[in-house]
Amino acid sequence: MYLTRLALTDFRSYPELSIELGPGVTTFSGPNGEGKTNLVEAIGYLATLGSHRVATDSPLVRRGADAAVLRAAVTGAQGNTLVEIEINPGRANRVRLNRAPMPRPRDILGALRTVLFAPEDLALVKGDPGERRRFLDELLVATAPRYAGLRADYERVLRQRTALLKSAGSKGHLRGAARESMTATLDAWDAQLAQAGAPLLAGRMRLVAALRPHVTAAYEAVSGGPPGESCEISYRASVFNNNEFDNDVPGLEVAMLKALAGVRASELDRGVCLVGPHRDELELSVGGLPARGYASHDESWSPTPSRS
């Protein structure tokens, strides 16, 4: 798969841009501030529907413009594909695939696939667990686009269940019929959260298992470190003790329900959901020690490019 053309309208510093590309290596060169990173960011956005530099879309639209348009012509095993995204800050983005409007932005995922290595990727080692979860989910969606819908479903249920926990906590200790009603409502949301979370959890665990040997081999090739000082990755799920689990979806759903029941009192006290994929961690270790706390700055870079 490779790009044959990239066209931008009002994206970042570019009022209009159209460049022809081809197979093989393409290098963008020029003085600082000329927009080289903006080109890479645009390609990444077309592939993932997100920027590696900012969390919202507003900075992506050129100052004074209402919207930005990104287009990429892609050649791959399935032939030629035209991917188009219209970025509308504050409104729904619009996407087209081969000029046909798609009902949801995520419907274009998989049409263009990329691997990015940027300074921001150091957060994969040094950043918060949320950065590593986001990386896992982006990679999961890139390999199997259906996970975009599964992740969206889980996040929707999580928001609604969290709102219920906060509401219940603000009412103090309920009694009688009110308590029974709240318990029944929480039971229903627990079931929905487990049903939505189990497939996402299973996908993440399978992905980590598939990545593990490649990460170890890539780290050794990049670092040139002493024998035995390898990089390992593992997935720590909040719904299990001692990381003893199976990655079949029905079993994970049961495990989530059990874990949710075990922390319900604490969740009501704190008004937050304490277990589930949103609380899990992708752990990286170098030489048997956590990379986040023990690796030097230079060592922290080695596991980062190895993900490609």
Where are these regions (language model features)?
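Conserved NTPase motor "head" modules and their coupling/switch loops across ABC/AAA+ ATPases, GTPases
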Residues: 1-31, 45, 174-308
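Flexible interhelical turns and helix-capping residues at alpha-helix boundaries
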Residues: 32, 50, 140-143, 147, ...
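Conserved lysine of the Walker
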Residues: 36
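Nucleotide-state sensing region of NTPase/ATPase domains
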Residues: 44-147, 209, 213-220, 252-265
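A conserved P-loop NTPase coupling/switch region
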Residues: 106-111, 119-195
